[in-house]
Curated annotation (Swiss-Prot):
Keyword list, A-Z: Hydrolase, Serine esterase
Name under which the protein is recorded: Putative esterase/lipase
Primary enzyme class: hydrolase
EC number from the UniProt entry: 3.1.-.-
GO molecular function, one term: carboxylic ester hydrolase activity
Length: 10
């Protein structure tokens, strides 16, 4: 939910 958001933030 948030981890993917952080990693995909790149």
């Amino acid at each position: 939910s948030i981890i993917t958001d952080v990693l995909a933030x790149e």
